Amino acid sequence: MSPHSLVFPARSQSLIRFAFRSLRSSSVVDILLVHNATKLVKMKSFTQALSIAAGLSLSFASPTPEISSRQNGSKNLLVFGDSYSTVGFWPGGTLPAAGNPLGNPALPGQTTSSGLNWVGHLTSTLNTSLVLTYDFAVTGATTDKDIVDTYAQYCVDDQVGQYTQYVSSKVDKANTLVAVWIGINDVGEPFWDKESAPVTKIMDRYFQLLQTLADDGLTNFVLLTVPPFSDQIPAMIGQSETDLARLRSDITSYNQALQDRLATFKSSNSGVKGLVFDTKPSFDTVVENFAKYGAKDATCYGSSDCLWADNYHAGLAIHKLLAENLVKGVAENFVF
């Protein structure tokens, strides 16, 4: 188990047991429960506990896919983000190599999707080259916990530090794509606190970190938007409409700022290529056509006939379509 697979205190053992029941029965979880409080737990604590539990589950529910045999030369994928991107990678352990493109753990990795997530698809099913993936994403991460606090051990600022320490000298930067999918918790944590997200501060830090990567010689970026989770994930059912309206506004502001800041970033860094990939169409397509994707409805979670792996995380169908659309979206700058 990697150092960021946390052992954590639980406010209620019954809460954690309920969270675990939402995970696939085939998951393997090694975790210590510490009962240190008896007061009522609010919804935010539930989703945090569930997110951690999901992040700790080894996704063996789906068989490990065969790595594409069409290897026309090695390429690198660097991923920074949160639970929607994590595979459980620890950069101080085994690094990606031919035959083991995630490094540690092996495909499909340790995900929150009940199997192969979008990162795994880019690495193993949609590639025409050998793609070595260094996925620093960690469940619960925000851009910087000094701006939006979180229980996550490693936020994106820490993840960039890990890249610098462990990986920078090992990758051919000319054949590397940097994918950043962060923001769900940057706007989500303030939502649960009934506050507006500090979007300007988040973006300032976000692009400071991108500048660190660009200064290290990385020139090819794709930045994924925050999906419309305010109106789609099961955890939002029954939430205050006032709070949801504020969250929708924060998501819109965040995604627009991403577009605006990237344009400035590219103009300030000669040779840098980059685009913002809109995640909304992929989510909308699956949610609006749930039956086509094998789901009994658009809001159930935790079983093979549901779109959602748990009440906060997208399942296999959404991840697969998103990966397919991303491959098309970045094709002008990077071919997997």
Over which residues does each language-model region extend?
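Conserved active-site regions of diverse hydrolases
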Residues: 44-46, 53-336
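Fungal secretory targeting signals
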Residues: 1-11, 15-71, 336
